[in-house]
Amino acid sequence: MIPKNIYVFWHQDRLPLVTYKLFLNIKQKHPDFKVTKFTDKDVLKIKNKPEFFNTVLFKDKTRVSDWLRMYLLHHYGGVWIDINCLFLNKSLNDIIDFSLPKVQGFHLFGNIFENWVIASPPKNKLMELWFHETEKCLHRKYSYCIENGHYYDSSHPLVNQLPH
C-alpha cells in the first residue's frame, strides 16, 4: 500500500509567488494527504547521507531534488511531485491506485519513466535499486554516464520491474 504522503522540494523557505500558488494547488487538490515541503535546511538534517553529499552534491539543487525524491520514496513511501505541477481537474486519487504495492508514475516515450510524479510503497525493491543507482550516478557523474551509456540504447533491467 502506498501512504498518502506528498513530498515536494524547494531550496529556500520562501517560495516565489507562482511556485507558492502551485504549492497551494497541490495542497487544495489533496486534502486527504499529508503534504510536506522540504527545503535545504530539512535536507541537511537527514542522517545517513552519502559522504559526497555535503561537499559535491549540495551545490546543485536539481541533484539535491533527485537524491531527495529517491531517498524519501525508498525509505518512507508516498508520492513525489515536482513543486511546479498544476492539478487542473483531477487529483492523485484519480491517477494512482494507492492499494497497489508497486511503483507508479508516467511512462511516456520509449523506455523513459518520468520522475516528476512517482508513487511508491516504502521499502519497494525497485525504489531501493533506483535509489542506489541514483547515488552512484550523482557521486560519479560523468564517468557513470560514460560507463553506462549502452543502457540508453537498450532496455534497462529496472524497466522490466514497472507495472506498466
Language-model features, listed with the residues they occupy:
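Glycosyltransferase-associated regions of secretory-pathway enzymes
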Residues: 1-66, 81-164
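Small-residue hinge/turn detector
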Residues: 66-78
